[in-house]
Amino acid sequence: MGVSKKPDLNDPVLRAKLAKGMGHNYYGEPAWPNDLLYIFPVVILGTIACNVGLAVLEPSMIGEPADPFATPLEILPEWYFFPVFQILRTVPNKLLGVLLMVSVPTGLLTVPFLENVNKFQNPFRRPVATTVFLIGTAVALWLGIGATLPIEKSLTLGLF
């Protein structure tokens, strides 16, 4: 490779071209038909071949065989339902538990109306939305981890 000359940004002709949007690189290899007809099918077929190869060479069992006469002590939902399961498990009144679950999306729907800012701004310039996101993530993790523990340790995560 040779030495490439850097553009002089003080040049008025170059500044005029950049102001008109002419500084972009529009040349190169076109996506049609090269990428869409040749490269993408190769990638897709390669991915399918890897999946089939792994399934044939390393077959994994789906799980242990079902025993209809043995029920586990505690039946847990899938991992993405852990926070909701924890709310329903710890709140004594079931109606209150359902209202708490409904209040989460309702509260999230009100966040955009609390801040009067442009939606394309930096997240750090939206303190209410950032705070709601961070606190909501922490609470969801806390509830999700607590759902995997026994009911006595679920709220304190066994720390206290």
Swiss-Prot record:
Q: Which organism is it from?
A: Oryza nivara
Q: Which GO terms describe its molecular function?
A: electron transporter, transferring electrons within cytochrome b6/f complex of photosystem II activity; electron transporter, transferring electrons within the cyclic electron transport pathway of photosynthesis activity; oxidoreductase activity
Q: Where in the cell is it found?
A: Plastid, Chloroplast thylakoid membrane
InterPro entries assigned: Cyt_b/b6_C, Cyt_b/b6_C_sf, Cyt_b6/f_cplx_suIV, Cytochrome_b_C_euk/bac
- Could you list the residue ranges that cross the membrane? 36-56, 95-115, 131-151
Top-level taxon of the source organism: Eukaryota
Q: Tell me what this protein is called.
A: Cytochrome b6-f complex subunit 4
One GO cellular component from the entry? plastid
Task: Give the gene name.
Answer: petD
Bilayer disposition of the protein: Multi-pass membrane protein
Q: Which NCBIfam families match?
A: cytb6_f_IV
The Gene Ontology biological process annotation of the record reads: photosynthetic electron transport chain
- Primary localization class, coarse: plastid
Q: Which HAMAP family match?
A: Cytb6_f_subIV (MF_01344)
Biological role: Component of the cytochrome b6-f complex, which mediates electron transfer between photosystem II (PSII) and photosystem I (PSI), cyclic electron flow around PSI, and state transitions.
- Known partners and oligomeric status: The 4 large subunits of the cytochrome b6-f complex are cytochrome b6, subunit IV (17 kDa polypeptide, petD), cytochrome f and the Rieske protein, while the 4 small subunits are petG, petL, petM and petN. The complex functions as a dimer.
Q: Which UniProt keywords are present, listed alphabetically?
A: Chloroplast, Electron transport, Membrane, Photosynthesis, Plastid, Thylakoid, Transmembrane, Transmembrane helix, Transport
The family note in this entry says:
Belongs to the cytochrome b family. PetD subfamily.
